[in-house]
Amino acid sequence: MVWSRTNQLIAAAAEGLGARAEPLGREHTDYFMRLSLGERRAIVSKTRSPFLTQVAQGLANNKHLSRELLRARGLPCAEGVLVDESGDIHGPAVRELLARHGRLVVKPNWGNRGVGVATDVRDLATLARARDRARGLDLDEEVLVEPFIAGTNLRVAVIGGQAVAAAEVVRPKLQVGRSAEAQVAALNGDPRRGTWSAPSLCPMDQIEAEEDLAGHLEVYGLELEAPIPAGREVEITGEELEVIDRTDEVHPEWLAVAASACDLLGVDVGGVDLRGPMAAFAGPPASAAGAALLLEVNVVPALHLHALPTQGRARPVFAAFVAYCLQLPGAPPPCAVVGV
């Protein structure tokens, strides 16, 4: 039996707390695990706690609706236009967004792990291709179009209503003049990248070029084997180049924004994505003046980013997760009531 990286980290954290982590049934499944300590028991699904409701998970997964609700409660959320299966990607709302910002991001409204997300979309032809790809990957064929926000991808981990860690996630960008295939091969030579077939505690994963990158490149009119042309910036969404711990550099009010977003959506264990200049996160949200914004709340929050950063201090997020799920003394109480 081989646990995934996430479950290996959960099991190690449980052991460190004197608890047990064991399979739920006779046949191995990586999706469920039983935690126990004395009379305390909890069944978890990766980093989903036993207190998460289906309503809260579904609400958080709907990026457009959850953002609308959070914005109505005063949180600094990015704007966006929802295009459903009958909507026109070239409609006036999207055209106005493109004219006003010049660069857009297109993503599945119910997306996960950055799959189907196209950044740096600058023209209508690319916009249409990005729409088609995102729609095909979305649960309800819905596409979210939003402005491209320059700056840093900041992920904040929230456990039991408390923001416990923050990390800058640097995405790989393909360089001009070399093929995507060659550049991905070079990236995969990094010993810090592990494989899905043999899970380890490597902080990053191998990039499967044929699995998702080929379709991603088609959005920009590019191919895996062809050199990246001048003037084109292609970010490999959903992958990491570096993960830098920023917990001690983020202003407490931004951490409070992340915790509030989770609380309002009923998400007790979440990863909140913020984006903007790193300098904006050093001060309170009011001082950022729209330069930094909240993008989304993720229900399966990739806690390994904080436990295994490539730079900076590792944070004990899995110990906090286990303690919360088992409701050990000192852990925050369950908080999975939708409050918007």
PLM region descriptions:
Residues A150, V158-S260, L264, L303-A314, ...:
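ATP-dependent carboxylate/phosphate-activation module, predominantly the ATP-grasp catalytic core
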Residues A42-T47, T53-L201, P252-L255:
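Active-site nucleotide/adenylate-binding loops and adjacent lid/helix of ATP-dependent enzymes
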Residues F32-A42, L154-I159, A163-A165, A280-L305:
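A short beta-strand motif that forms the metal-chelation/ATP-contact edge
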Residues M1-M33, S200-L217:
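N-terminal-biased segments
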Residues E235-E249, D263-V269, G276-V340:
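C-terminal active-site "lid" helix and adjoining low-complexity regulatory extension at the edge
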Residues P23, R155, D273:
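Short, surface-exposed charged micro-motifs
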Residues A21-V44, E225-R232:
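Short, composition-biased local secondary-structure segments
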